[in-house]
């Protein structure tokens, strides 16, 4: 039996600690980002796949606990798939191509940052199969596998001519990368590993530059990526003057200035501090308000140093990439 990325007890503990004021539907994404950072999954080449697996495991846990309905989760997945394909595809299902009624060649929708066609995926599958000593798969069998995997979902089906051979054509399916990953998951373990890496690389090469996050879960996801860029940020995030807000008094030697981090990810500084307090990461009251709790300091996510600034006691807090 395959070992899960995180245990049910770890999921339960993370939800209890960090989602007190969060709507249930936002919990899977937020807790998945929490594990991506704390377990350093963001350093792996298949981090996008791991993030999706984490979300699925957390959703399953919430369904088991009665906090989410299966129908609600299924509706959200369908809505997400429709949104991803709707941005780039005029989605419709056409009648299957048959030899009795040859269909004219149709231009295949080109690959974008969100889509890939079955011919490109089939080529990648057969290259991986060849390297692993497995036989190649024919287009008709591959299309059957795709149709079975994507049953009830949105995708584009078209036809392409067999070169100069008149009257002969074959089906081509254009799908999202998320759907392609599920098709790839049907391959053997060795082939699957190679495919996932190649799909990730192809998607990143075709994806547009990331936009400023609009929600807190998106900001947490970006935090994992920013941790990898720490060395470049260190030179730019030096503390300014002594008489600035608490966050701007944080020195940056081995981490990220919390106030500047909020600006980088497009959040208001006070909103970020408020969320960290509400979720039990920072102290909420007293002289040590906004100071990280000891368990997060011990885990290496923050470093704290007590200093004196203009005859006032203060704290230097660094958000580390651990």
UniProtKB/Swiss-Prot annotation:
Annotated DNA-binding residue span(s): 258-277
Keyword DNA-binding set for record: yes
Task of the protein: Antagonist of the C1 repressor or repressor bypass function.
One function term, GO molecular function aspect: DNA binding
UniProt xrefs under InterPro entries: Ant_C (IPR005039)
Source domain of life: Viruses
Parts forming coiled coils: none
Keywords on record: DNA-binding
Pfam families in alphabetical order: ANT
Entry keyword annotation includes DNA damage: no
Identification of the protein by name: Antirepressor protein 1
Organism classification: Viruses, Duplodnaviria, Heunggongvirae, Uroviricota, Caudoviricetes
